[in-house]
Amino acid sequence: MKRGQRLERVVALAAEQENEAARILAQASRQIDEAVAQVEAMRRFRAEYCARLQREGGMNALQLNEYRAFLANLGKAIEEQEANLQRMRQEHAALQRSWRQLHCRHKGVGKIRQKIARQEQGVVEKRVQGELDDRAAARRRRRG
């Protein structure tokens, strides 16, 4: 088996690894988009809740305490989601670096395979040319 043929499996494996990393990266991107939408929805809800309270006017002490507690819990939930979103973005950056490395590896192995294929083709062409030259020389000797 020629070197170029042996490298085919290495190139295929590098392509598989790159594609899998790209799939995982795309999934992480979708999850970030979903998390951003969720945080934005929670912020809108909080703003709407505050606006509704201001429109409705006064409330008794018990209602005010419940309102404050609810807003505090909602604020904590938003902070937790934002922290989770930050972790997701950091993980996404790491996945992106990993994909980039695998992409470069796949590209590099592919270039090596192409170089070896060109070398092997050159050897074949040189051998064929040598055979053609030998045949032509043999014909000249037979004629001469």
Residue map of PLM features:
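Charge-rich amphipathic alpha-helical interaction elements
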Residues: 1-144
